[in-house]
């Protein structure tokens, strides 16, 4: 079969948030663009098996949890009735709607889409194998935005249909009676939130000493108390062996010191131990692209690799693996390719664990401030002091801000609570714009709201708080 010849200025490999953002911005800047995607549904992991479908399920989980809370105040409903097919159908409609939207945007921008697997021939051409046709695409510049894949463990029998990864789990193939999640990171916690709400008995096993160990323990302790009755988390533990039985998967679990060992039978095991770069099929060694020890492509502040006309963005270049970071990188790399002197230099990148309650953070943590010998001060407001939180049955939360005592500027913040991710934007903007505590304290916030906790935290630092005891007033 003779390959079709295609010549273009810019090629983007991957149609996730990083890839399509780069493609569309390049087109808007007047460049001729070809977008390569291996699957027929555009949007990458985020849209198809990640961010969007999981948030749909997490919304369902939140509603279920909120309904159960109403029994505390005299309102109860009949037994929960879950129509799994209807849930799956609605999820599919959401994905198709957004994927179709991306296709329409590409068409209106004259971005050509080629479906197939790409691999490098040399630094200025790739081979793309589609379902029916193959292509040799020549280009001036290329952007690798192929994303990431679920990391695998060598001792896991992945050929067993009872072993899931997060991409499969988000499709809700079934609701297991007993579910083991290996990995207590954000993905593991979100999956536990979903399946426990739907009725599964969920255990999480993680080999670290605590969940999200880079965050401050005071805020994480509030989260753990809130989910204490939803699922079990076993720290400092590892899965040693999995035995495939007819009636389930027999898991040999041991603590890190190997002193305490036990066997547990599970219906399903979900492996969520992190992600690895999706580069194996690209044949990047042919062009000599440099990677780090974990296989992530090395880039500079303009996302250029060691090959001058080859760029990389998104998950494929490493942590933090966040769609919104990738989108921003897509915009920057397009500006660079078009000849502008743009660089990736954000002060902060917000992060959210979309559990219930949510955990959202940005900037420096207290632990980091201490390690870096920053003269800082913490200012926190517990949500059980917020009228909106108490009246909305979501009082298990906290808003914690970190201020630099020399400049009074806000340098970090963490929120645990319902819709914490939606509240984080003000803190992110405040850090990015160099706001100090007075800026936040003197900005009138609506009452009663959850976001006024940011204002109150700033008032505590300023020593002007009236809604709580002012510990800075000397009598």
From Swiss-Prot:
GO biological process, one term: 2-oxoglutarate metabolic process
Enzyme class label: oxidoreductase
Residues that coordinate or bind NAD(+): 183-187, 206, 239, 272-275
Catalytic activity: N(6)-[(R)-dihydrolipoyl]-L-lysyl-[protein] + NAD(+) = N(6)-[(R)-lipoyl]-L-lysyl-[protein] + NADH + H(+)
GO CC, one annotated term: cytoplasm
Subcellular location: Cytoplasm
Cofactor binding comment, as recorded: Binds 1 FAD per subunit.
Residues holding FAD: 37-46, 55, 118, 315, 323
Subunit structure, as described in the record: Homodimer.
Record's miscellaneous remark: The active site is a redox-active disulfide bond.
Protein's recorded name: Dihydrolipoyl dehydrogenase
Gene that encodes it: lpdA
């Amino acid at each position: 079969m003779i390959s079709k010849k295609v010549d273009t200025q810019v090629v983007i490999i991957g149609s996730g948030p990083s890839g399509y953002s780069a493609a569309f911005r390049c087109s808007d800047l007047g460049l001729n663009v070809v977008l390569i995607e291996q699957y027929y549904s555009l949007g990458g992991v985020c849209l198809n098996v990640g961010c969007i479908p999981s948030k749909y399920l997490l919304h369902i989980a939140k509603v279920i949890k909120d309904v159960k809370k109403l029994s505390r105040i005299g309102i109860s409903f009949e037994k929960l009735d879950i129509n799994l097919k209807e849930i799956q159908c609605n999820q599919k409609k959401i994905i198709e709607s957004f994927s179709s939207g991306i296709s329409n945007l590409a068409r209106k921008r004259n971005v050509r889409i080629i479906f197939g697997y790409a691999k490098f021939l040399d630094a200025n051409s790739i081979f793309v194998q589609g379902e029916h046709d193959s292509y040799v695409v020549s280009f001036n510049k290329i952007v690798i935005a192929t994303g990431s894949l679920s990391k695998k463990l060598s001792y896991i029998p992945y050929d067993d249909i009872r072993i899931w990864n997060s991409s499969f789990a988000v499709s809700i193939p079934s609701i297991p009676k007993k579910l083991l999640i290996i990995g207590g990171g954000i993905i593991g916690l979100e999956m536990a939130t979903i399946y426990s709400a739907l009725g599964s008995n969920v255990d999480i096993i993680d080999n670290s000493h605590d969940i999200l160990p880079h965050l401050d323990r005071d805020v994480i302790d509030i989260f753990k108390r809130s989910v204490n009755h939803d699922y079990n988390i076993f720290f400092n533990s590892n899965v040693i062996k999995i035995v495939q039985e007819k009636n389930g998967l027999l898991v040999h679990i041991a603590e890190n010191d190997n002193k305490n060992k036990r066997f547990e039978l599970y219906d399903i095991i979900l492996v969520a131990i992190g992600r690895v770069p999706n580069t194996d099929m690209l044949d990047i060694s042919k062009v000599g692209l440099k990677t780090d020890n974990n296989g992530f492509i090395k880039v500079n502040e303009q996302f250029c690799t060691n090959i001058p006309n080859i760029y990389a963005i998104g998950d494929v270049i490493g942590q933090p693996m966040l769609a919104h970071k990738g989108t921003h990188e897509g915009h920057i790399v397009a500006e660079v390719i078009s000849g502008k002197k743009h660089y990736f230099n954000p002060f902060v990148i917000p992060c959210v664990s979309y559990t219930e309650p949510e955990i959202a953070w940005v900037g420096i943590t207290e632990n980091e401030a201490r390690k870096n010998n920053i003269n800082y001060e913490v200012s926190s407001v517990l949500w059980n002091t917020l009228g909106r939180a108490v009246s909305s049955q979501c009082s298990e939360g906290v808003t914690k801000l970190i201020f630099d005592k020399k400049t009074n500027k806000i340098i970090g913040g963490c929120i645990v609570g319902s819709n914490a991710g939606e509240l984080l934007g003000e803190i992110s903007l405040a850090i990015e714009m160099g706001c100090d505590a007075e800026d936040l304290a003197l900005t009138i916030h609506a009452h009663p709201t959850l976001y006024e906790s940011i204002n109150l935290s700033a008032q505590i630092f300023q020593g002007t708080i009236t809604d709580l005891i002012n510990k800075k007033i000397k009598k």
